Amino acid sequence: MFLLYEYDIFWAFLIISSVIPILAFXISGILAPISKGPEKLSSYESGIEPMGDAWLQFRIRYYMFALVFVVFDVETVFLYPWAMSFDVLGVSVFIEALIFVLILIVGLVYAWRKGALEWS
C-alpha cells in the first residue's frame, strides 16, 4: 500500500523552500522606500557614469557560442560521476557513455559546420 506520510518531509521542505523567497520579496517590497527618478533609472557600472547608450545589443553569434559552451559544460557534469565510479560499473555503462559522447561530438561537428564557433 502506498503511504503518503512517507513523503511528509519532502512536502514540508517544498513548502518551506517556496515560502521563504516569497516572504523575502514581500517584506522587501513593503519596507523599501519608493523613489523613482533619473538617478534610479540610469544604469550603474562600477561607480562610473554611463557614457552614451547603456544598452548594447549582442550579436546572435555570441548566444550560439554561449549555448555550445553550456552544452559541453553540462556534459562534464554528467560524465564526472560516471568517471568516478568507472571501476564499479560494467561494460554496458561504458558503451552508454560512449554513445553519449559520440552524440555530443556529432553536435559539435554540426555547430562547427554551421559556423557557430566562428567569432568574426
Curated annotation (Swiss-Prot):
Its EC number is 7.1.1.-. It is found in: Plastid, Chloroplast thylakoid membrane. The chain crosses the membrane at residues 9-29, 64-84, 88-108. Keywords: Chloroplast, Membrane, NAD, NADP, Plastid, Plastoquinone, Quinone, Thylakoid, Translocase, Transmembrane, Transmembrane helix, Transport. It catalyses: a plastoquinone + NADH + (n+1) H(+)(in) = a plastoquinol + NAD(+) + n H(+)(out); a plastoquinone + NADPH + (n+1) H(+)(in) = a plastoquinol + NADP(+) + n H(+)(out). GO terms for molecular function: NADH dehydrogenase (ubiquinone) activity; quinone binding. It holds the Pfam family Oxidored_q4. GO terms for cellular component: chloroplast thylakoid membrane; NADH dehydrogenase complex. It is a multi-pass membrane protein. One of its GO terms (biological process) is photosynthesis, light reaction. NDH shuttles electrons from NAD(P)H:plastoquinone, via FMN and iron-sulfur (Fe-S) centers, to quinones in the photosynthetic chain and possibly in a chloroplast respiratory chain. The immediate electron acceptor for the enzyme in this species is believed to be plastoquinone. Couples the redox reaction to proton translocation, and thus conserves the redox energy in a proton gradient. PANTHER family: NADH-UBIQUINONE OXIDOREDUCTASE CHAIN 3. Belongs to the complex I subunit 3 family. NDH is composed of at least 16 different subunits, 5 of which are encoded in the nucleus. This is NAD(P)H-quinone oxidoreductase subunit 3, chloroplastic. It comes from Eucalyptus globulus subsp. globulus. The lineage of its organism: Eukaryota, Viridiplantae, Streptophyta, Embryophyta, Tracheophyta.
